[in-house]
C-alpha cells in the first residue's frame, strides 16, 4: 500500500512537471541552491570566514563567520560577538537563506556585530571526526546531550579565543535553545561566558507538542530503528537537491514544497517568501543522527527534560553512574534570557513554553507572537521588524 501511494505521488509530480495544461513552467533556479554557506554569505556582498573546531570527543565542527557588515568594514575596533545556533535537522544556512535585508545573520553584521554561526555534529557541514568516519555506527552515537556537553563549549571557547572577547550573545532556535538550556545550566563556567541568551521558539519539554513529529516519537525505539536504521536521519542528499531545483521551482509545486515545511511546524504560509523555497529546501533538512531522533522520541513519551535513556539500568549506570537518565533543571541556569514564542508553533507549543517560562530564573523579556509558527523565527517575512530589531535593541541595552 505504501509503495502504491509513493508511486501515485511520483506520477502526480511528474505529470505536473510535464503538463502543458498547467503551463509546465519552472521559475529560474536560484544560484544559492548550489552554494555552501560561505558562498551564500559572499554572494550577498558580506565578508565570509570558515573555521573547523575539534570537540573534546573528536568531532570536527564547521563555524561560519561574518566579521562585519557591508558598510562598517573600516571600523577596526572590537565588535560585540553573536553566536547563532540552528535547530533540529538544520544548519548555519538558516540564518542567511533569506534576502540580505531579512536574514538575521546579515542584519546583525550590518548593525555592527561580529556574527558566528554554528553547525551541530552530523549535519551537512559537520560530518568529520578525528578517528571515526560517517560509515561507522560509532560516529552517529550522539544526541542533543553531546551537542550541549561538547559542541557548544568547543564552539564558544574557540570564538572567544579568536576574537579576544570575554562573552558572546547566544541566539538559539528550536533545538539550538534546547542545548543552550542544558549547557548553561550544567556548565557554570560556560554560562559565565554568555552575555545574554535569546531563545527563539524554545524547546525543553515537549509534553504538549502537536507536530506530526510527535506522532513519530510515540513509536517504539526498535520500530524507529527498523524504519531509519542506526546512523543518520534525513541528511541533505542529491535527491533532495533535485527536488529543490526541479520540483520546488515549479509554479504549481512550489506551494506544495512550502506546505511540506509547515506540515511539521505549523501553518503561516502568507509569511513565507515563496521565491526562496528552492533555497530553503536545498539546504534543509541537513541531517542528524537517528539516536538524536530517538532522544526526542523519548522526550515525547516520557514528557521529561532529561538525558538520553540508553535502554537499560546497566547501560544508564555505565553512562551516568545511576540507573536512570539524569533530569535537566533549567532553573539552574542564571544567564539573562529573552524568549520569543509563536501562537501557532506546533513544536514549541504554547503550553510547553508557559511551563518553561516559570523555570527560567533570569527571564528579562518574553513576547508571544500569536500567528507565528516554528519557522517564522528564521524565515518569516515580518521577522526583521517583529523580532530582529528587538533582538538588536536588547543586545545594545545589555551591552
Swiss-Prot record:
Modification after translation, per record: Glycosylation is not essential for catalytic activity.
Enzyme Commission identifier(s): 3.1.1.13
Keyword terms: Disease variant, Glycoprotein, Hydrolase, Lipid degradation, Lipid metabolism, Lysosome, Signal
Keyword Cell cycle part of the UniProt annotation: no
Any one of the GO CC terms: fibrillar center
AB hydrolase-1 domain span: 80-380
Active-site residue list: 174, 374
Role this protein plays: Catalyzes the deacylation of cholesteryl ester core lipids of endocytosed low density lipoproteins to generate free fatty acids and cholesterol. Hydrolyzes triglycerides (1,2,3-triacylglycerol) and diglycerides (such as 1,2-diacylglycerol and 1,3-diacylglycerol) with preference for the acyl moieties at the sn-1 or sn-3 positions.
Disease implicated: Cholesteryl ester storage disease: An autosomal recessive, mild form of lysosomal acid lipase deficiency characterized by accumulation of cholesteryl esters and triglycerides primarily in the liver. The clinical presentation is highly variable depending on residual levels of lysosomal acid lipase activity, and ranges from early onset of severe cirrhosis to later onset of more slowly progressive hepatic disease with survival into adulthood. Age at onset varies from childhood to adulthood. Wolman disease: An autosomal recessive, fulminant form of lysosomal acid lipase deficiency manifesting in early infancy. It is characterized by massive infiltration of the liver, spleen, and other organs by macrophages filled with cholesteryl esters and triglycerides. In addition, accumulation of cholesteryl esters in the zona reticularis of the adrenal gland leads to adrenal calcification and cortical insufficiency. Death occurs early in life from inanition.
Listed name of the protein: Lysosomal acid lipase/cholesteryl ester hydrolase
Amino acid at each position: 500500500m505504501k509503495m502504491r501511494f509513493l508511486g501515485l505521488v511520483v506520477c502526480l509530480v511528474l505529470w505536473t512537471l510535464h503538463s502543458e495544461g498547467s503551463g509546465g513552467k519552472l521559475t529560474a533556479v536560484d544560484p544559492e541552491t548550489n552554494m555552501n554557506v560561505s558562498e551564500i554569505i559572499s554572494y550577498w556582498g558580506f565578508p565570509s570566514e570558515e573555521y573547523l573546531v575539534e570537540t573534546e570527543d573528536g568531532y570536527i565542527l564547521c563555524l561560519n563567520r561574518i566579521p562585519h557588515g557591508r558598510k562598517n568594514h573600516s571600523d577596526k575596533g572590537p565588535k560585540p560577538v553573536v553566536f547563532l545556533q540552528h535547530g533540529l535537522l538544520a544548519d548555519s544556512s538558516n540564518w542567511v537563506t533569506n534576502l540580505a535585508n531579512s536574514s538575521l545573520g546579515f542584519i546583525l553584521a550590518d548593525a555592527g556585530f561580529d556574527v558566528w554561526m554554528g553547525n551541530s555534529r552530523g549535519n551537512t557541514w559537520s560530518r568529520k571526526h578525528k578517528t571515526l568516519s560517517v560509515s561507522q555506527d560509532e560516529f552517529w552515537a550522539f544526541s542533543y546531550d553531546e551537542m550541549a556537553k561538547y559542541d557548544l563549549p568547543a564552539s564558544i571557547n574557540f570564538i572567544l579565543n579568536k576574537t579576544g572577547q570575554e562573552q558572546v550573545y547566544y541566539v538559539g532556535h528550536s533545538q539550538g535553545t534546547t542545548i543552550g538550556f542544558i549547557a548553561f545550566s550544567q556548565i557554570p563556567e560556560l554560562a559565565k561566558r554568555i552575555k545574554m541568551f535569546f531563545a527563539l521558539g524554545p524547546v525543553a519539554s515537549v509534553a504538549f507538542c502537536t507536530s506530526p513529529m510527535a506522532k513519530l516519537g510515540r513509536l517504539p525505539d526498535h520500530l524507529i530503528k527498523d524504519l531509519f536504521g542506526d546512523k543518520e536521519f534525513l541528511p541533505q542528499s542529491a535527491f533532495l537537491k533535485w527536488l529543490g531545483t526541479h520540483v520546488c521551482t515549479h509554479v504549481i509545486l512550489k506551494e506544495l514544497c512550502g506546505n511540506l515545511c509547515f506540515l511539521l511546524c505549523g501553518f503561516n504560509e502568507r509569511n513565507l517568501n515563496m521565491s526562496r523555497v528552492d533555497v530553503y529546501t536545498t539546504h534543509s533538512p541537513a541531517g542528524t543522527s537517528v539516536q538524536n531522533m530517538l532522544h526526542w522520541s523519548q522526550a515525547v513519551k516520557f514528557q521529561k527534560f532529561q538525558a538520553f535513556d540508553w535502554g537499560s539500568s546497566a547501560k544508564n549506570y555505565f553512562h551516568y553512574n545511576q540507573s536512570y537518565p539524569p533530569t535537566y533543571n533549567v532553573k539552574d541556569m542564571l544567564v539573562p534570557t529573552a524568549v520569543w514564542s509563536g501562537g501557532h508553533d506546533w513544536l514549541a507549543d504554547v503550553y510547553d513554553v508557559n511551563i518553561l517560562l516559570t523555570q527560567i530564573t533570569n527571564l528579562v523579556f518574553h513576547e508571544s507572537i500569536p500567528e507565528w509558527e516554528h519557522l517564522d523565527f528564521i524565515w518569516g517575512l515580518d521577522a526583521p521588524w517583529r523580532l530582529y530589531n528587538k533582538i538588536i535593541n536588547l543586545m545594545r541595552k545589555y551591552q
